[in-house]
């Protein structure tokens, strides 16, 4: 969840992150509010996805509707000290082949090799971070895979990060003029242009396009969305409101996209194309995704980190 702030895939689109200059009670209140939002959003998303499981056509999706299973976990930091933890929410259903909606709140000290890479950690390695992370892979190749995460990070500085992106798995649907692409981009733009006025949609859309790119394939992972990090406008309440708007936009648009596609029948060729496209997803997450790499190198929960990988995949 806490990624490095450097690297080829992370152009410096974030605003300058300010040094914290406030009393402890204010910082703690902000931590509490951010964590509460992430966990409430998790609950709303899980409930929405379970309704989709109930409503999916029985003829295409036989069997019982899936339900989320929650598994708590704890972590230790590099010194062995207690470092918080989280809750994995996983579902393998008749519509959602695999979906994880995870919340975590972690704290501790960054290992020496990471301190220079994190804003505010070079001289004081202590950190706190809370967030929500989601990836969904559906059985129906007509329904795109999706990823969303938002987080709040505190060192001697504090900032928000996150985003959402859509990955159609059929080439004929992987276009910017596809109805799903248009609707998803419109929803993310709406989240960025709310009255709080602290987000830059054009930058965050471009950042997403550049981040979710496989250079060895010379292709994008999906059709894009938004991606942002080190977001600190100087108005914390507005920054939280923006992050909430991203979550609400996702909660509205993705179930709509699922519903408009889940009654479409698919062929064996569609499934084959889906499995091959999932291979690209695996390649990106294991080779380039800084959250995955960082989590594996800093003692994160392996099951949670790798839950983003699809349950079945092929390479031709």
Curated annotation (Swiss-Prot):
UniProt catalytic activity: coproporphyrinogen III + O2 + 2 H(+) = protoporphyrinogen IX + 2 CO2 + 2 H2O
EC number of this enzyme: 1.3.3.3
Highest taxon listed in the record's lineage: Bacteria
Keyword tags: Cytoplasm, Heme biosynthesis, Metal-binding, Oxidoreductase, Porphyrin biosynthesis
Database matches in PANTHER family: COPROPORPHYRINOGEN III OXIDASE, MITOCHONDRIAL (PTHR10755), OXYGEN-DEPENDENT COPROPORPHYRINOGEN-III OXIDASE, MITOCHONDRIAL (PTHR10755:SF0)
Gene field: hemF
Name used for this protein in its record: Oxygen-dependent coproporphyrinogen-III oxidase
Catalytic residue positions: 147
Record's subcellular location: Cytoplasm
Pathway given in the UniProt record: Porphyrin-containing compound metabolism; protoporphyrin-IX biosynthesis; protoporphyrinogen-IX from coproporphyrinogen-III (O2 route): step 1/1
Gene Ontology CC terms: cytoplasm
Assembly description: Homodimer.
MF term (GO), any: protein homodimerization activity
One Pfam family this sequence matches: Coprogen_oxidas
Family the UniProt entry places it in: Belongs to the aerobic coproporphyrinogen-III oxidase family.
Alphabetical GO biological process terms: protoporphyrinogen IX biosynthetic process
PROSITE patterns the record matches: COPROGEN_OXIDASE
Record-linked InterPro entries: Coprogen_oxidase_aer, Coprogen_oxidase_aer_sf, Coprogen_oxidase_CS
Residues annotated as site: Important for dimerization: 216
NCBIfam families: PRK05330.1 (NF003727)
Major place of residence: cytoplasm
Naturally occurring in which organism (per UniProt): Bradyrhizobium diazoefficiens (strain JCM 10833 / BCRC 13528 / IAM 13628 / NBRC 14792 / USDA 110)
Annotated residues for binding of a divalent metal cation: 137, 147, 185, 216
């Amino acid at each position: 969840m806490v990624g490095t702030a450097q690297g080829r895939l992370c152009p410096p689109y974030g605003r300058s992150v300010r040094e914290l200059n406030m009393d402890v009670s204010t910082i703690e209140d902000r931590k509490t509010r951010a964590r509460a939002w992430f966990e409430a959003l998790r609950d709303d998303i899980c409930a929405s996805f379970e309704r989709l499981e109930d409503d999916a056509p029985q003829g295409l999706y036989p069997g019982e509707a899936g339900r989320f299973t929650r598994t708590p976990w704890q972590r230790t930091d590099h010194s062995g000290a207690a470092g918080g933890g989280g809750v994995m929410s996983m579902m393998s259903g008749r519509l959602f082949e695999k979906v994880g909606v995870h919340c975590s709140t972690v704290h501790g000290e960054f290992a020496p090799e990471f301190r220079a890479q994190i804003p505010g950690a070079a001289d004081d390695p202590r950190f706190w971070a809370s967030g929500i992370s989601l990836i969904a892979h559906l059985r129906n190749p007509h329904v795109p895979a999706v990823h969303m995460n938002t987080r709040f990070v505190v060192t001697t500085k504090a900032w928000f990060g996150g985003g959402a992106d859509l990955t159609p798995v059929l080439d004929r649907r992987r276009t910017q003029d596809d109805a799903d692409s248009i609707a998803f981009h419109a929803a993310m733009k709406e989240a960025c242009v709310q009255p709080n006025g602290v987000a830059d949609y054009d930058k965050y859309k471009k950042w997403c396009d550049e981040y979710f790119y496989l250079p060895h394939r010379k292709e994008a992972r999906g059709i894009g969305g938004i991606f942002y990090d080190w977001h600190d406008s100087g108005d914390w309440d507005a920054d939280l409101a923006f992050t909430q708007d991203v979550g609400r936009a996702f909660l509205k648009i993705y179930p709509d996209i699922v519903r408009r596609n889940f009654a479409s029948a698919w062929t064996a060729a569609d499934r084959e194309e889906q499995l091959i496209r999932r291979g690209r997803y695996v390649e990106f997450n294991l080779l380039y995704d800084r959250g995955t790499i960082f989590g594996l190198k800093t003692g994160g929960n392996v099951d949670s980190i790798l839950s983003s990988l699809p349950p079945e995949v092929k390479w031709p």
